[in-house]
Design a protein with these regions (language model features):
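Short hydrophobic alpha-helical segments enriched in small aliphatic residues
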Residues: 4-12
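Positively charged, low-complexity intrinsically disordered leader regions
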Residues: 19-46
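Short beta-strand segments enriched in small/hydrophobic residues
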Residues: 49-59
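Short beta-strand elements in bilobed, periplasmic/extracellular small-molecule ligand-binding domains
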Residues: 52, 74-89
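Glycine-rich phosphate/diphosphate-binding loop of Rossmann-like nucleotide-binding domains
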Residues: 57-71, 153-190
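Non-catalytic terminal and connector segments of soluble metabolic enzymes
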Residues: 76-78, 101-103, 130-133
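Short, well-structured alpha-helical segments in soluble
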Residues: 94-106
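Anion-binding alpha/beta catalytic cores of soluble intermediary-metabolism enzymes, centered on
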Residues: 113-178
């Protein structure tokens, strides 16, 4: 197969691929600035600052890095941010009780339980314990069902991020086709 690169366009018999270099860091910085303004607006109009609480169980380095990045981004845009850390040995009931407490706490706008969880903790039970309105990941069955049915819902971060990136370059997505590789609950469904 012989492809020719001409001004960012690859030509091959019967199809054309257009390539666009996307500066994700720049777009993320722009989005953070927009969010910062929204947070300030909420504070001035309603005297309320949204709050994100993340539950991190165990000491897996990738999870710690990911949570640290979330905490940094939340602080950058002016959100209240809290990370609750538990050891791998934490009992499931302790986690469920904490989620129940956070669901009732009006200063907490969003709850995120960092996955994966230790084997002795039922992931589905933990996900279902989070109030659908505070489910940051969009994993609660109510949110998954609403999203699958085309109703307003929390959208998982990765697909939403991809959508926002695409919208920066292509304003009208009507009639467009997309390929999603993978079928995980986080990225590939629904």
């Amino acid at each position: 197969m012989d492809y020719t690169n001409v001004y960012g366009v690859l030509h091959k018999t019967n199809f054309i691929i257009i390539m666009i270099l996307i500066d994700g860091k720049k777009i993320a910085a722009e989005l953070r600035e927009e969010l910062k303004k929204e947070v300030l607006n909420l504070k001035s109009k309603h005297n309320k600052i949204p709050g994100l609480t993340v539950i991190l169980i165990g000491d897996m380095v990738p999870s710690q890095i990911y949570v640290r990045m979330k905490e940094k981004a939340a602080n950058e845009v002016g959100l209240k941010s809290e990370v609750i850390r538990y050891p791998d040995s934490v009992e499931e009931k302790t986690v469920l009780d904490k989620i129940d407490e956070l669901n009732k706490d009006e200063s907490v706008s969003g709850i995120l339980v960092q996955l994966p969880l230790p084997k002795h903790i039922d992931k589905q039970k933990v996900i279902e314990a989070i109030s659908p309105g505070k489910d940051v990941d969009g994993f609660h069955p109510v949110n998954v069902g609403n999203l699958s049915s085309g109703y307003e819902s929390t959208v998982p971060c990765t697909p939403l991020g991809c959508y926002l990136l695409i919208k920066k370059f292509e304003k009208n997505l009507s009639g467009k086709k997309a390929i999603i590789v993978g079928r995980s609950n986080l990225n590939g469904k629904p």
